[in-house]
Amino acid sequence: MNDLLSKHQFSLISNPNVALSAPYGAEQAAVLNTEGLRTARREISSWPGYQPTPLVTLSGLAKAANVGSLYYKDEGRRFGLGSFKPLGGAYAVFRVIEGEIRRTSGQQVTSIDLFDGAHRDVVADVTICAATDGNHGRSVAWGARMFGCRCIIYINEAVSEGREKAIASYGAEVRRIPGSFDDAVRMA
């Protein structure tokens, strides 16, 4: 294992600005909180094909890197997307649709309600737009297809044709633009 690390540039850098004793205040809790995590888990675990994914222990690599332990959460097979981050984009699609339904009808909905066809008319009028270099766009496109809304994904000129096709295979309109990822973000 040490041979593996010696063949590659590797350095462990500690964050010099970390404040381990800093309070987790209202500003942080507004973004990431226990209730939000419970809600996300409840919704995502209700999606068709949901299965927990493994947490893999990389003890040899941890030893070679001189760290106490190292773990890898293997998301690559989740929902058959072949993406290392399949949940966030699709969950964001749900949250946008959920918010639009709440805004237009005052009703609270779940993923199951949407799978059962509730508010199909509202969902059909939603267009989700995002920029990506690949994995995020695949998740967003899959989520849009799953929930029944339109999806436009912007990619930059350097994104491979394979990634473009993978995103388009979920029904998204993919728009390739000149420039960088930041240019794709501006278009989205």
Model-identified regions with their sequence ranges:
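PLP-dependent amino-acid enzyme catalytic core
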Residues: 1-188
